[in-house]
Curated annotation (Swiss-Prot):
One of its GO terms (biological process) is translation. It comes from Methylocella silvestris (strain DSM 15510 / CIP 108128 / LMG 27833 / NCIMB 13906 / BL2). Pfam families: Ribosomal_S20p. Binds directly to 16S ribosomal RNA. The gene is rpsT. GO terms for molecular function: small ribosomal subunit rRNA binding; structural constituent of ribosome. This is Small ribosomal subunit protein bS20.
Length: 88
């Protein structure tokens, strides 16, 4: 239990940041899922569009500290490799 005013404020700040981070992480996962669904359907055009939308969100999540930068780079790299391997 937080006793000092500064500790109480820190708890409030952490709750706000946790909510923001949850939202960003959820949004990132949604966009990545859209890319994976487009890849599964075999639609190269839709997969490319979805990847273009997802990449900035994934990298921004890394920049904000929601995921590690190597994790974000790995996700983008693997998704782009799968998109480019789709038949044209």
């Amino acid at each position: 239990m937080a006793n000092t005013p500064s500790a109480k404020k820190a708890v409030r700040k952490i709750e706000r940041r946790t909510a923001v981070n949850k939202s960003r992480r959820s949004q990132m996962r949604t966009y990545v899922r859209k890319v994976e669904e487009a890849i599964a359907s075999g639609d190269r055009e839709a997969a490319t569009q979805a990847l273009r939308a997802a990449e900035p969100l994934v990298m921004r999540a890394a920049q904000k500290g929601i995921v590690h930068k190597n994790t974000a780079s790995r996700k983008v790299s693997r998704l782009s490799a799968r998109v480019s391997s789709l038949g044209s």
